[in-house]
Each structure stands twice: as structure tokens, then as C-alpha cells.
Regions:
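Short N-terminal segments immediately surrounding and downstream of signal-peptide cleavage
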Residues: 32-49
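Sec-dependent N-terminal signal peptides
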Residues: 1-31
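Intrinsic-disorder/low-complexity detector
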Residues: 6, 29-30, 52-60, 64-260
Length: 260
């Protein structure tokens, strides 16, 4: 889940208003006139309340402090470890199916993907004693907003860099998958790939929710697959043994806006 910052609104109520509504006023007493500053404070508070309501309706994540972020991160890692174990079993079934279909190029590619995923899983299992106090992500306030569907989320530079990585990793994997299907003379279908359905390669369980990483990985994958299967370079290029999505395409996918 993306990170937001706690915005506490403190409204100063004038002494006259407290006396009038909180303590009661004798019948022969007259409440003091409201000052201009007091009226402005009430107006600001009303605007802040309306803004919070709009943000909630827009689907903005609830704000969290640093300790809450750490607790969420620990829970996220635990759930991710379990998910990766389940994905290993799914991958074994997919590999057996590829062998039955004699899709040799796709089978080799998937085995390579699984080997990298297993290495990633080992690294995540070693995060039990992770020192969150030394990770600047947890003390860096949000500075960017990104949109997904009808919701928007806030994160800092570390989160944006991870989402950018997701798109590029997805493009590279999609490019290779498209090439493999073409070599196997198999019908074009990027959704049939385990890597597309898994979409976890490169995700270490930190900074952004897995659903967000998966979403942007698949966005890159789909475009990479189209380039690979069609033997073209519409969305990216292949240099130094790796596929990289074009900057303009990447920017249109991420749709990131600076907020401060």
C-alpha cells in the first residue's frame, strides 16, 4: 500500500466561543464579537474538512506515521513470502505443461525466470532482522503521486524508482517471452506466460504494495511481448543484452506527478 503523511488539523477556537457554547452564558451577558482571525480559522477548518472528504472519495490512502509504515512493511513481507511459495508450485505445473506442448524456447525461458525468482525468494527470507531505521525510505516524506485506475497514491523517490524498475523488468521479460513464442511457432498470447501472471520478478516486498508492482510489471510486459513477438521496436529497444522501454512510454505508463 502506498505511503501518505499524517496531516493533523488544529483549529483554534476563540475564548468567546468556548464560553458561549461550552460553559454557558448568563442571560444578561453578551458574547464578545468574533475577531477576523477566528473567522478565518473556522473557514480554513471547513475547507480542510472538505478537502479530506474529497481525498477519501478519490480513494486516497489513509495517512500513516513512520511506525505504522514499519508494521505494514513487516506484514507485507510475511504475506509475500507465503505468496512466493505458492507461486513455485504453480510454476512447476506450468513447466510440465510447456514440456507436453514441446515449447522448448518458452520452457527454457521459464526455467531461467524461476531460477531468478528463487534467488529473490532467498534474499527475502533473509530480511527477518532488517534494520528499518537505516532505510531512508521510512523517514522520507512522499513527494510524488501516481494514479492507478480511479485511485491515486503517494510515495517518495524510492517508491517511484521501484515502479520504474517494474515497468522496465516487465518490458524485458515480455520481449523475451514474445521472442520465445515466435521461435516455438506458438500463437501470440502474452497472458499465457507464467512471468506475466506472476509479475513478481524484481519485487523485494518493500516500498510499494505487491499489487502496484504487479500492475506496472504487466504494463511493461505486454508492450515488450508485442515488440518481441512482432520483431519490432515500437515500445522499447534491446541493447547490451537487455530490453529497455522508451522513456516516453515509461512516463505515460507511470503517470507520476510531483506534489512538493
Amino acid at each position: 500500500m502506498p505511503v501518505t503523511v499524517v496531516n493533523r488539523i488544529v483549529v483554534t477556537i476563540g475564548i468567546g466561543a468556548v464560553v458561549l457554547f461550552g460553559l454557558g452564558v448568563p442571560t444578561n451577558a453578551q458574547p464578545p464579537p468574533q475577531h477576523g482571525q477566528e473567522q478565518q480559522d473556522k473557514k480554513d477548518a471547513k475547507q480542510q474538512k472538505a478537502q479530506k472528504k474529497q481525498e477519501k472519495q478519490a480513494g486516497r490512502e489513509a495517512p500513516h506515521d513512520q511506525q505504522t509504515l514499519v508494521r505494514q512493511q513487516q506484514q507485507r513481507l510475511a504475506q509475500y513470502r507465503e505468496h512466493l511459495e505458492q507461486q513455485q508450485r504453480v510454476a512447476e505445473q506450468q513447466s510440465a505443461q510447456l514440456e507436453r506442448q514441446h515449447r522448448r524456447a518458452q520452457y527454457r525461458l521459464q526455467q531461467h525466470y524461476l531460477a531468478r525468482l528463487q534467488q529473490q525468494q532467498l534474499r527475502i527470507q533473509g530480511q527477518a532482522d532488517y534494520d528499518y531505521s537505516r532505510d531512508p525510505y521510512f523517514s522520507t516524506p512522499p513527494s510524488y503521486r501516481y494514479f492507478r485506475g480511479d485511485r491515486y497514491y503517494e510515495t517518495n523517490q524510492y517508491g517511484v524508482d521501484l515502479l520504474r524498475q517494474a515497468v522496465n523488468y516487465g518490458y524485458d521479460e515480455g520481449l523475451r517471452t514474445g521472442l520465445a513464442d515466435r521461435q516455438d511457432r506458438w500463437e501470440s498470447n502474452y497472458r499465457d506466460s507464467f512471468a506475466y501472471r506472476d509479475a513478481n520478478y524484481g519485487y523485494g516486498g518493500f516500498y510499494v504494495d505487491r499489487d502496484d508492482y504487479n500492475n506496472y510489471f504487466r504494463e511493461g510486459f505486454r508492450r515488450g511481448y508485442e515488440d518481441g513477438y512482432g520483431d519490432r521496436s515500437q515500445y522499447g529497444r534491446f541493447t547490451d543484452g537487455r530490453g529497455t522501454i522508451l522513456d516516453a512510454v515509461l512516463a505515460s505508463i507511470l503517470n507520476v506527478q510531483a506534489i512538493r
